[in-house]
Amino acid sequence: MNVLVIGAGGREHALAYKLNQSNLVKQVFAIPGNEAMTPIAEVHTEISESDHQAILDFAKRQNVDWVVIGPEQPLIDGLADILRANGFKVFGPNKQAAQIEGSKLFAKKIMEKYNIPTADYKEVERKKDALTYIENCELPVVVKKDGLAAGKGVIIADTIEAARSAIEIMYGDEEEGTVVFETFLEGEEFSLMTFVNGDLAVPFDCIAQDHKRAFDHDEGPNTGGMGAYCPVPHISDDVLKLTNETIAQPIAKAMLNEGYQFFGVLYIGAILTKNGPKVIEFNARFGDPEAQVLLSRMESDLMQHIIDLDEGKRTEFKWKNESIVGVMLASKGYPDAYEKGHKVSGFDLNENYFVSGLKKQGDTFVTSGGRVILAIGKGDNVQDAQRDAYEKVSQIQSDHLFYRHDIANKALQLK
């Protein structure tokens, strides 16, 4: 069959790579993709992921059987709806169901209604109310802007000055807009991907841990993710089971009960508190860079899993008996302003690297985004995989990239 992957980043590179391995898949297309994907997919960088009509025309022309949507924006913009209305199979939720990521308030309200464990919250609609609220709120406080923010719409404020600054950042010159304040939760964060079709929820039996902050020791601003690893040895199968029972199954049922037909992967960003696992966020798609490490470890056929889910079967994932560590190299300045167009070399285009922000300029690759390339390390345990990942990092040549030096350290410290 012919499969079209929507998106241009490292997550989509990993999806295309994994789908290309399937015996069920004849041809992988990518829109817009990136030029690093050309060994595994027919890449169409001339088509934008926001040009729904062009994507539909392409899918018709190429007899596409399945469309796999990687990023959140096309989902929230309703690309899945348009494709389904024209008879295409789509892995990714419709516009209504994608609100679970598109609106933090939507997610909070549904969790509150169905008693799904999460932090207490307060919503405000005006800047002046936000400034009033923080005068007496408990610190630290988590400040979230409603809507999409590419993983950067969350600020943890330890002081009242930091909270005021967060509000200024969230509102800018606007006086109105929804901001959600949350009680700060302490504990170990982890990411659980769950395949969902209506009230059928099939969680991965392998979790990943992301590293959101820009710099070592979890310092600096939030990013889209500076690295990830799997499995997470210090989070037990019992925690996974509990997360499934208290979060994954209830949210699938809640969404269906509220009239939202979710089909795709639901990313559960959770935290293991002293009172058990609680939800930090939901995403309506694979995490990035979690997808890259999880799909590298997945032994079974991703396309088969998607078909099983579509048929309402409780699909069984199989995993390689190894650890995977992914280290993200990003443009200096990210997640704030950064330069583009700098040469990057030293990497190969096989399973050792997944590309997020590079484009071809003549025969060389140059930077085109904030997060640039993820180096993948593999090993019998986290320590060996981490060593391998940083060996892969050392092979990349560029004066304009930075990376964290402590990806997966937590797993080694908590052994």
UniProtKB/Swiss-Prot annotation:
Does the keyword section mention Magnesium? yes
- Annotated residues for binding of ATP: 134-191
> Which catalytic reaction applies to this protein?
5-phospho-beta-D-ribosylamine + glycine + ATP = N(1)-(5-phospho-beta-D-ribosyl)glycinamide + ADP + phosphate + H(+)
Single GO biological process annotation from the record: 'de novo' IMP biosynthetic process
Pfam families for this protein = GARS_A, GARS_C, GARS_N
Q: In which pathway does it act?
A: Purine metabolism; IMP biosynthesis via de novo pathway; N(1)-(5-phospho-D-ribosyl)glycinamide from 5-phospho-alpha-D-ribose 1-diphosphate: step 2/2
What keywords were assigned to this record?
Answer: ATP-binding, Ligase, Magnesium, Manganese, Metal-binding, Nucleotide-binding, Purine biosynthesis
Q: What class of enzyme is it?
A: ligase
The UniProt record gives the binding positions of Mg(2+) as 281, 283
Q: How is the cofactor bound?
A: Binds 1 Mg(2+) or Mn(2+) ion per subunit.
Q: Which InterPro entries match?
A: ATP-grasp, ATP_grasp_subdomain_1, PreATP-grasp_dom_sf, PRibGlycinamid_synth_ATP-grasp, PRibGlycinamide_synth, PRibGlycinamide_synth_C-dom, PRibGlycinamide_synth_C_sf, PRibGlycinamide_synth_CS
User: What EC number(s) would the UniProt record show?
Assistant: 6.3.4.13
- ATP-grasp domain span: 108-311
Required cofactor names: Mg(2+); Mn(2+)
Write out the GO MF terms: ATP binding; metal ion binding; phosphoribosylamine-glycine ligase activity
Q: Family assignment?
A: Belongs to the GARS family.
Which PANTHER family does its entry note?
A: PHOSPHORIBOSYLAMINE--GLYCINE LIGASE (PTHR43472), PHOSPHORIBOSYLAMINE--GLYCINE LIGASE, CHLOROPLASTIC (PTHR43472:SF1)
Q: What is this protein called?
A: Phosphoribosylamine--glycine ligase
UniProt source species = Staphylococcus aureus (strain MSSA476)
